[in-house]
């Protein structure tokens, strides 16, 4: 069975494939008993484990059931988390919440919010042969038809992610003389890359990674904090679903960093991939083409609900382009009209430079796919990384090619990707600093751009995962 997770997440110290299962077998600490402690492990035909002592006595060893958080804290393969993910974060869970709302007494319902990514919207637009704006309106119509209360666009949250990434880079560039780990800055929006970095390279790589939250998790802050306040609700009274182009986003939403201890709720309760939304449509017997469009929802009255918006710089969010333009202007007073990409090893590794009088002032790169990520990390370890900033994504070709996107059976992969890029770029673009509602929220919700509150709600932290010494680390 092929894993839907990104290549970076399928890495493991085992050479054989561990298929997903409900009960992952994890080493369990057993209290030492007096004696020599010499024993053998016998594996039965049914897969159960027995300890065989020297005197011939046998003892069945424990089989530990692990949660998704256990899997995230493990240093090995994460494919065994797949079934847990599918049961905890699936369209069936959304159905349960919607059904519970129908049965609930007045005032006991949870407010259901769905936030849709631009990449998922482009994928569904391609499948149903619609333009992105019609797709957004018809998706709003569909979700409200099945009981969802509000449908938002995560592009609004991406404004904050981009702005925080811009500010962080400029700050770290200015600090590079005082810190060896200030540069390069590595983008943080891809959870597959983050999970791989934490598990495989740990404390070496983590200081380089941007602390800016991804658009999904900024949306989590917006919905469970700002929007909850607007609706006079506590965060646990809102059920927040995101629609994303990859399965790795389920792992991101499940991180303890994005869990509200006071209200015992996650910023994002459920992540659906584009494919899961398509299955939901099929199960409801609905085609997007047949639905009447509905008005789009805006998080604030100043956010346009007429049409969706996006950003320049490609289908992975435009991190390189926005940080590059801002840094050129802020650090060197240079206005960049067009960003020119120079392909290097392959189309997924490209470079951008800012030069003045023959001197390179800034050198940025995009590194998509695990092969290029490995090369980047090796350069860093050898002290030969020439870049100031790198937009890193685990999926080859970036987020439009995420593992949760719809595949076209009659279309070549490259042809479908070109179609998605065209649809993605059809949407109106805006600079994040000029987006309606953004500055208003910085002042009134976050209490200023550089406030402690802005840092807490728009940034995160990373955790190196220690590799335990166990039999599971044996290479076969």
Curated annotation (Swiss-Prot):
Positions bearing N-acetylalanine: 2
GO biological process: hematopoietic progenitor cell differentiation; intracellular oxygen homeostasis; iron-sulfur cluster assembly; regulation of gene expression; response to hypoxia
Xref: SUPFAM superfamilies: Fe-only hydrogenase
Family that this chain belongs to: Belongs to the NARF family.
Cellular-component GO terms for this entry: cytosolic [4Fe-4S] assembly targeting complex
PANTHER family in the cross-refs: NITRATE, FORMATE, IRON DEHYDROGENASE (PTHR11615)
Pfam entry (one): Fe_hyd_lg_C
Gene3D superfamilies registered for this protein in UniProt: 3.40.50.1780, Fe-only Hydrogenase (Larger Subunit), Chain L, domain 3
Annotated signal peptide: none
Any GO MF annotation of the entry: metal ion binding
Keywords from the UniProt entry: 4Fe-4S, Acetylation, Iron, Iron-sulfur, Metal-binding
Protein function: Component of the cytosolic iron-sulfur protein assembly (CIA) complex, a multiprotein complex that mediates the incorporation of iron-sulfur cluster into extramitochondrial Fe/S proteins. Seems to negatively regulate the level of HIF1A expression, although this effect could be indirect.
Source organism of the structure: Mus musculus (Mouse)
Protein name from the UniProt record: Cytosolic iron-sulfur assembly component 3
Binding site residues for [4Fe-4S] cluster 1: 24, 71, 74, 77
